[in-house]
Amino acid sequence: MPAADTCVRNARLADASAISRITEGYAGEGIMLKRSVENIIEHIRDFFVADYKGQVIGCCAIAFYTVKLAEIRSLAVLEEFRNKGIGRLLVEKAEAVLSEEGVNEVFVLTLNSGFFKRMGYKEIEKEYFPQKIWRDCTNCPKRMACDEIAMVKTL
């Protein structure tokens, strides 16, 4: 079982290409916005990776909005490792780090609300997060017809 042999760790610069490849598949499906390798390198300290026997098979990132509010973003797992608990491991690691930092509320924008609901997230209106809208959504090509669901969890 891959989850049992998978370690979730802080991303390293050497992981940037793997993160790009993993997220590119999701971007191609319209599930997330494309991030360049340069952007990933610039934000590498925000990323965690799932490492399975030396191979990066998944990733997620965190973004702070206030000292008490953060977002989990860029959650992606290689197709052959999906539905094996890898996404859960990544989210749990991100939540643990955020909790250690004193964050008490974490949100996501997702097309997979069922996954996050099972992780204890509740649906909420996007307008609850004006910081996110002003930072990221204004430049999003889907901003006028956003199909993502905002969800929040208290840590």
From Swiss-Prot:
Concerning Pfam families, the annotation shows: Acetyltransf_7
Keywords from the UniProt entry: Acyltransferase, Transferase
Give the record's GO biological process terms: L-arginine biosynthetic process
Which principal EC class is assigned to this enzyme? Answer: transferase
N-acetyltransferase domain mapped to chain residues: 6-155
Q: Transmembrane region positions?
A: none
CDD domains linked to this entry: NAT_SF
In terms of InterPro entries, this protein maps to:
Acyl_CoA_acyltransferase, GNAT_dom, NH2A_AcTrfase
Gene Ontology CC? cytoplasm
- Name one molecular function that GO assigns to this entry: L-glutamate N-acetyltransferase activity
Q: What is its EC number?
A: 2.3.1.-
Q: Which family does it belong to?
A: Belongs to the acetyltransferase family.
Protein name per its UniProtKB record: Uncharacterized N-acetyltransferase CT2212
Q: Which organism is it from?
A: Chlorobaculum tepidum (strain ATCC 49652 / DSM 12025 / NBRC 103806 / TLS)
